[in-house]
Amino acid sequence: MDMVSLAWAALMVVFTFSLSLVVWGRSGL
């Protein structure tokens, strides 16, 4: 796994995590 793939994977994980956090926060969970 090269650095570009690793960077993209990390970016997707952070984006998905923050997005789900916002959704859960608005749901009141």
UniProtKB/Swiss-Prot annotation:
Q: What is the lineage of its organism?
A: Eukaryota, Viridiplantae, Streptophyta, Embryophyta, Tracheophyta
Entry's Gene Ontology molecular function annotations: electron transporter, transferring electrons within cytochrome b6/f complex of photosystem II activity
GO biological process terms, semicolon-separated: cytochrome complex assembly; photosynthesis
Q: Gene encoding this polypeptide?
A: petN
Question: Where is this gene product found?
Answer: Plastid, Chloroplast thylakoid membrane
A Pfam family assignment: PetN
The record lists the membrane-crossing segments as 3-23
Protein's recorded name: Cytochrome b6-f complex subunit 8
Organism whose genome encodes this protein: Cucumis sativus
Q: How does it sit in the membrane?
A: Single-pass membrane protein
| Assembly with partners or alone | The 4 large subunits of the cytochrome b6-f complex are cytochrome b6, subunit IV (17 kDa polypeptide, PetD), cytochrome f and the Rieske protein, while the 4 small subunits are PetG, PetL, PetM and PetN. The complex functions as a dimer.
Function as written in the Swiss-Prot or TrEMBL entry: Component of the cytochrome b6-f complex, which mediates electron transfer between photosystem II (PSII) and photosystem I (PSI), cyclic electron flow around PSI, and state transitions.
